[in-house]
Amino acid sequence: MKIIRKNKKDKERREQYKQAEQMKNMYKMLRRNELLDQETRNYFNMQVTSSEKNSSISRIKNRCVETGRSRGIISAYRISRLRFREYMKMGLISGVKKRSY
């Protein structure tokens, strides 16, 4: 299966976030610690603000793992609503039926 550029980029961002998350949380905790002097707290504040943009959770966008589509994602399956509908009609997704009123 061909890797879509957007999916590759998103995967890289997820990896960067995963690597930086623990250190970033530690710096945030130390930044809020009132037992430390102001200079030390300012240092940790700089560490948090100078981190990479791609290591932020807000840069991560849910995308369809097959098409790279960013809208209409069914998060439980990580595919777009269009692919979900196709697979549902073919019977590839168990336990899901078309709804009728």
Curated annotation (Swiss-Prot):
It is found in: Mitochondrion. The lineage of its organism: Eukaryota, Amoebozoa, Evosea, Eumycetozoa, Dictyostelia. Belongs to the universal ribosomal protein uS14 family. The gene is mrps14. GO terms for biological process: translation. Its main location: mitochondrion. Component of the mitochondrial ribosome small subunit (28S) which comprises a 12S rRNA and about 30 distinct proteins. Interacts with LIAT1. GO terms for cellular component: mitochondrial small ribosomal subunit. One of its GO terms (molecular function) is structural constituent of ribosome. InterPro entries: Ribosomal_uS14. Keywords: Mitochondrion, Ribonucleoprotein, Ribosomal protein. It comes from Dictyostelium citrinum. The keyword ATP-binding does not apply. This is Small ribosomal subunit protein uS14m.
